Regions:
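ABC ATPase "signature
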Residues: 220-221
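Conserved ABC transporter NBD signature motif
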Residues: 63-74, 78-79
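Helical segment within the ABC ATPase nucleotide-binding domain
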Residues: 175-188
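Catalytic Walker B motif of ABC-type/P-loop ATPase nucleotide-binding domains
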Residues: 160-164
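Conserved ABC ATPase "signature" region
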Residues: 103, 107-110, 114-131
């Protein structure tokens, strides 16, 4: 059981890129310990920027983010020790074998007996078997994603940050990724903060959803609560209605509590 009820606190987050491009404009939300929280919104709404700030890879212009009470700007190294991050395009050392990639990545965090245990767990998680002997450059996109995810899960992060985890994957590999994430969330209590354009995936995986438009939260709640509150049959309809309400001058995010 975590001493913290909230795994992630995002408050009044602002990010302005060079040239004055505003990616985030006062974004606030909270992710509870042990839940799967999904950010959804159109391209350019600020989802990836938010995840990169949470993962300590990008500094905000204003506001703050805390992961289990740790400020990601003031204590980035401590925050990173709590986080496992899988970007949409997870890179891999193409000339390494899958096995060598697993060992190298895990050696950046562990050593000795703990390293061997983590390597063994990553191998088991991946389910890649003999394919681990092959160079990563011969892997499909789905195999690379599974390989990278297995490494992140073997690190046993308290918070797993996933940017479009199944984008571009075939049905089989997408199902494998979703199943692994849900398994580790349920069995190991890993909190998940993710983004996705796949609304069916969000409804299957997420305990709560945060809808972002123009760098601000415009709606939040469980998928069922949001659909019921907005009189919608799916999350796409929910988003469209919330966006129209926002453009029509409604103030503040719609909450389905």
């Amino acid at each position: 059981m975590s001493a913290f009820e909230n795994a992630v606190e995002v408050r009044d987050l602002v990010k302005v890129y060079s040239g004055g491009v505003v990616a985030l404009n006062g974004l606030s939300f909270t992710v509870k310990h042990g839940e799967v929280y999904a950010l959804i919104g159109p391209n350019g709404s600020g989802k990836t920027t938010t995840l990169r700030i949470v993962a300590t890879l990008l500094k905000p212009t204003g506001g703050y983010v805390r992961v289990y009470g740790v400020d990601v700007v003031k204590e980035p190294l401590k925050a990173r020790s709590l986080i496992g991050y899988l970007p949409e395009e997870a890179g891999a050392y193409r000339d390494l074998s899958g096995m060598d990639f697993v060992r190298f990545m895990l050696s950046l965090r562990f050593s000795g007996r703990r390293l061997e245990e983590a390597v063994g767990e990553a191998i088991e998680i991946s389910g890649l078997g003999e394919d681990l002997k092959r160079p990563v450059r011969t892997y499909s996109k789905g195999m690379k994603r599974i390989l990278a995810l297995s490494v992140v899960l073997a690190m046993k992060p308290r918070l797993l940050v996933l940017d479009e985890p199944t984008a571009g994957l075939d049905v089989e590999k997408a199902l494998q990724v979703r199943s692994l994430v849900k398994k580790y969330n349920r069995e190991h209590g890993i909190t998940v903060l993710m983004s996705s354009h796949n609304m069916l995936e969000v409804e299957y995986m997420a305990d709560r959803v945060g809808m972002i438009y123009a760098g601000r939260l415009i709606g939040e709640g469980t998928p069922e609560e949001l659909k019921r509150k907005l009189g919608a049959s799916n999350l796409e309809e929910v988003f469209v209605k919330l966006k129209e309400a926002t453009l029509g001058g409604a103030s503040g995010p719609a909450s389905a509590r």
